[in-house]
């Protein structure tokens, strides 16, 4: 679970943070997997403290505890399911680059700019992400395949080609 925080028009209440952690924990228990956490500069310290109280975080990357942004590529590699709060296109992009379909988590209160919502819609249209509300995390199932590496690679190549074409003009 990659956690951001309030930003770009996404706002999380204290109860939503608690529900997010509890529902993610339930999801992991149902699937008999170990929860791993990655926090960011915007993740409230209280949320990180709650995670440390409830879970073994020896494999997690916790920003406030480590006082730095740790590397987490290895966690994306070993993760069976990648959940990311939807408040950061950078975090979503990093997760998608793993080649695994990403579950983007959103709060009830969103007032993001239209341009940002278009990014989310594009990722959804490319089937890189599946959106999920906080209250439905524990019930989440993928409607389609989870290995999207070929689609991610193809999208990357198309983007590179379009950049080269623009530079020629």
Model regions and ranges:
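Active-site donor-nucleotide binding/catalytic segment of nucleotide-sugar enzymes
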Residues: 1-45
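Conserved donor-binding/catalytic loop of nucleotide-activated donor transferases
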Residues: 77-79, 97-101
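Acidic, divalent-metal-coordinating active-site segment for phosphoryl/phosphodiester hydrolysis
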Residues: 90-97
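Donor nucleotide-activated moiety binding/catalytic core segment of transferases
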Residues: 50-90
